[in-house]
Amino acid sequence: ICLETRFKRDQHLSQGEVLQLLDFCGWTVDTQKRLMKGVKLLPNAYQQVSRDMASQRIHAIREYLRFLYLRLAQSKDRENIAKYVSETIKSYKPKIKKYNKNKIIALSDEQIDTITQKLLLGHPENPWKDRSIQLRNLLIFSILYETGIRRGELASLYVNDIKSTVVSIYRRHNNPLETRKQAPNAKTGERTIPITDGLARLIDIYVMEHRGSVKAAKKHPYLFVSHRKNMGKPMTINAIHEVFKAARLAFPELKGISPHKFRHHMNYRISNMIDEEHKDVAPSQRAEIDGQVRPYLMGWSPNSKMQETYNKRYNQEQAGKMLVARANKFTKGRKNKYQY
């Protein structure tokens, strides 16, 4: 909308346009930029300013619109029209939605530093003393960070689901090999997700030197096993929760962290990847890329089945390249992240 052109024609903003503009005042600058670029955001990804800040913005907009309209409009009723719009804006109260009360869903830098440094094998603050358990739990956190998979998908991973630097997610409902009382199931679509070389090497070490030395682990295909009680049996959902509970108790900065929070953080990373990798393309094209990459990486059903059919390989390649580039950029400069 060109305000100058509209006002010169004695056309003020409609009530709907005014309300949309004022609603926009409630978002942070970063959120506004993402919306203007055409990036699709999940509800929890919206970040909101304080009510006072929103009110200050609205006041400034009200004064500017009144000034500009009186300056450019030619209508004899411009005073009354400007007054009506100003009163409409003045009576507006910024909307504060429950999911937007400045709740940060993504992992903080402090939390990431703790996970990637203090959970390393042999670190003096590592809450687990057994080396096999240290390595297994580091893998749990690292795989969740790099892939954003669900806890059920994590617990369902087979050793052979990880080949080289690719993790494959499969749906195995009614699996005859499943012996756990609470069977973990994949709720999302099957997909392949790339991981970094460092994480792939660490998984190989765990499988060959730690899991491989446990006799009972050879009786089933699951990647993660117990190294104490029920030695060698597949790791349960409850056991994964206990890992996170121990981490939260050991490090106050990890308060509120859970497997699902890594999934939220993955969406945050995807948004950043799209912004960085496609900053020079048109907003409509960026939104289209978002609609292809995000559903695939997260295992969601695509909006268009035809698009999925014809662009599946392209989507996989683009998603993989972007994800690996982002992960490698993150690990660069963090010395000994995957030290063994």
Where are the regions that the model predicts?
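N-terminal core-binding DNA-recognition domain of tyrosine recombinases/integrases
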Residues: I1-K98, G122-P127
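Conserved tyrosine-mediated DNA breakage-rejoining catalytic core shared by Y-recombinases
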Residues: S156-R201
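Short, charged phosphate-coordinating catalytic segments
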Residues: L70-Q74, L144-V166
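Catalytic-site neighborhood detector that most strongly recognizes the C-terminal catalytic loop/helix
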Residues: Y296-K329
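Basic, Lys/Arg- and aromatic-enriched nucleic-acid-binding interface segment
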Residues: Q117-R151
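Short, basic (Lys/Arg/His-rich) helix/loop patches that form interaction surfaces
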Residues: N126-P127, H241-Y296, W300-S304
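DNA breakage-rejoining catalytic core of tyrosine-based enzymes
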Residues: P94-L120, T179-D197, K215-H220
